[in-house]
Amino acid sequence: YTSLIEPLSLDEAYLDVTDSVHCHGSATLMAQEIRQTIFNELNLTASAGVAPVKFLAKIASDLNKPNGQYVITPDEVPAFLKTLPLGKIPGVGKVSAAKLESMGLRTCEDVQRSDLAMLLKRFGKFGRVLWERSQGIDDRDVNSERLRKSVGVERTLSEDIHDWSECETIITEQLYPELERRLSKVKPDLLIARQGIKLKFNDFQQTTQEHVWPRLNKDDLIATAKKAWEERRGGRGVRLVGLHVTLLDPQLERQLVLGL
């Protein structure tokens, strides 16, 4: 569909399909087709957001989860922003949203009516970003060269598991080989900063645990997973198992190499 892809996380990415000829150039139809392909090939549902700018696409992608999509056309942006809570804007956390609300700023429309100079004085660069987002402005391009910070792999299970041996088999036979393959594509030497595991339980709670580790290591991942299984599961069934690594910062890695 496009070569302009910016990964955000293990299962999320921005796509710029502005110049794509697929589906007669319709981003809505492309999103539908991609979601259907994911379901057909992986038996997994996916949500999508379609919008003229990145932050609105991100917001839209959360509106019809777990198996739907939401479209914001350019003409619909003003009406959509009018009632949009500021806390929905990526980068505006709970503390910032509470502070803004104490100033009488709850929605994008409230910010639209505010003085930019006041926002700059009170919040600095964040004030400008807030003002721009409230106007529907987001000049960031989809960056296909964005530095990857982590690599991971997960499996959602068709049935909950309750036996550690099943979890260990999934890690050793499925997840670890796939993680090693993915990591080798971006880091052939397998050097990393940290590695860890994730377990999601049948009550939708999850736990993660990781260690500082210089190189991908299967035995440590298995030991970490077993520790989390024994100490944090509490008898609950497990429906998702995941492994991940955090990559070394290139500048730090260069300093370490030079130090040697």
Positions of predicted regions on the chain:
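Nucleic-acid-contacting surfaces of polymerase cores and analogous helical-repeat interfaces
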Residues: 1-158
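Short, internal active-site loops enriched in acidic
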Residues: 19-21, 52-57, 200-204, 246-251
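DNA-contacting surface of Y-family translesion DNA polymerases
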Residues: 88, 101-240, 248-253
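Short acidic, low-complexity intrinsically disordered linear motifs used
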Residues: 253-260
